[in-house]
Amino acid sequence: MRIQAIRGVKDIMPDEIEKWRWVENKANQVFTRYGFKEIRLPIFEKTKLFSRGIGETTDIVEKEMYTFEDRGGEKVTLRPEGTASVVRAFIEHKMYTKQTVQKYYYLGPMFRYERPQAGRFRQFYQIGVEAMGTHNPSIDAEVMVMLMDFFNILKLKKFELQINSLGCNKCRPAYRETLKKSISKHLSDLCENCN
């Protein structure tokens, strides 16, 4: 019996590598131009980092993480996303003591136990950015402009930038109440998990 790749993962063959390197190099060029520095993150972390960071009741934590016990009995998880690991590294290495705004980007494989289908794999590659140390919304605008630059360099033709906001710390409680009132009219339409 031949051993094949596990369902939901994909080999990146030599004829595809140049395209991957080109995208990664363009990401590096664009992000460093905006002052973002690359950070390389571990492939696996303590499970509690993701359950705390992403939220214990999210689909990612409840259904999609690859979690196992290591030989020492510690629960570890293959990273499902990069944000929690960046925050952990930021705190662990006291990066908050360096300068006010810290800007990082990462790229690499992520892992989620999802039903494989077109464009959705259990091991997938993600490029992400994180900016910490400021509540100024101008950093969000900078990230959006930077990503538009990146997408244009990649010559992506069909993409749409959609912007959403939960509001600032002062306005967020009123926003939540308005949202709750709006949703309460439709609670009977929601499943048990969402209700």
Predicted regions mapped to residue ranges:
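TRNA-recognition modules of translation machinery and tRNA-sensing kinases, especially anticodon-binding
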Residues: 1-195
